[in-house]
Amino acid sequence: MDALNKLSATEAAARIAAGKLKSEALVAACLERIGQRESDVQAWAAVDPEAALAQARARDKEPRRTRLHGIPAGVKDVFDTADLPTEYGSPIYRGNRTTCDAACVAQVRELGGVILGKTVTTEFATRYPGKTRNPHNLKHTPGGSSQGSAAAVADWMVPLAFGTQTTSSVIRPAAYCGVVGYKPSFGLVNRTGLKALSDSFDHIGTLTRTVPDAALIVEELSGGPVTSFDAVAGMKPRIGFCRTPYWSQADRPTQEALEQAVPRLQRAGARVNVVGLDGEFARLVEVHTSISTYEMFRALAYERTRFPEQISEMLMGRLLGGGRVTREQYEEAQAVAQRCRARLADVFRDHDALISPSAMGEAPEGLDSTGDPVFGASWTVLHVPAVTVPVFRGPRGLPLGAQIVGPYGKDSPTLLCAEWVHRALTH
């Protein structure tokens, strides 16, 4: 039998449904892996092994209700949890306990899932790094801000974990750690109980090892129809190769990997053409900064005014910058974002998905930075579903991802395209 901790969520769900796997055995295997590797990877902010095993034993005694039944999940430490500390990656909240679960956490429990523990986040899910290391090379960053979730999934500690994305905080760490990162369409997963940064851009996303696993958890949470991946082999998707206005910031190996992928996708049956996003699309990183920092300055007003000495210099600089954004500038940035969303919808009339870089390159060496989020910011502003799939290797042997972007609200077709691209470029 395969090592149980290496099962995908979909594989584990099938075994549980068939009566061939107990949740307790699966959770125990994940906890064993954490015990072996956590001192190196440092992906977890809090784990209560006995509580996790107790949840699993309870699930084994209950009738199976959903595909999530008995499946362990990691929860980024920006979501409230009633039974584990919630510290938001900040010393301000060290030892903090909340009285209830975030909506998505409560849903996982309701659907029969097992909360394995809380994963490390950067400070308030911004850019000041946490303690986590990249499991592919411990001297390299795992990215951020969902760094613990990405590293835990990549290192076989848990089959799936929640992340959040306000800039590129699901896509970038997933790409750096060689896993699947899925940022759903804006608003698809309920955000109640998430530590807010930006009402305009905060997304709840997932880190998994397969695209079907990403579909599984979000479909169960959102009540959406089940995506069937049986038809993937016969697909002939219309894919736009989108360099984006920030192409020059990608390193040469990333550019070459994506350019060389185009004929491979065409041979596999896709219709691929170049899509340019010009004009106001080139302003979207600037737009993102104006909107997100304006909102962040207000969202963290309590922490900023009461505990300024416990906020990193990096974050305080961003907050103060947000305080200088005027209401007029904020509204103008929102107007640009709305116009670009409308223009992008026109692009998708002729394309099922776009393919673009997930990050500038491999995970940078060192733990003082989480890398540059430039290749996630635009898609976050545009509110569209985005999936990064691990399909390349860089010159240092570290993972490189390809980012598949679809039309707003078309998450299932986007996931199907992402799975098709993954198969076309890895098989």
Question: What would you call each of these model-derived segments?
Answer:
Residues 30, 52, 76, 108, ...:
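Conserved hydrophobic/aromatic pocket- or pore-lining residues that grip, position, or stack substrates
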Residues 68-88, 236-238, 290-345, 390-401:
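Short helix-loop capping/hinge segments that flank enzyme active sites or metal/cofactor-binding pockets
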Residues 69-203, 242-244, 357-370:
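Short glycine/serine-rich loop/turn segments
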Residues 20-28, 57-60, 253-276, 301-306, ...:
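Acyltransferase
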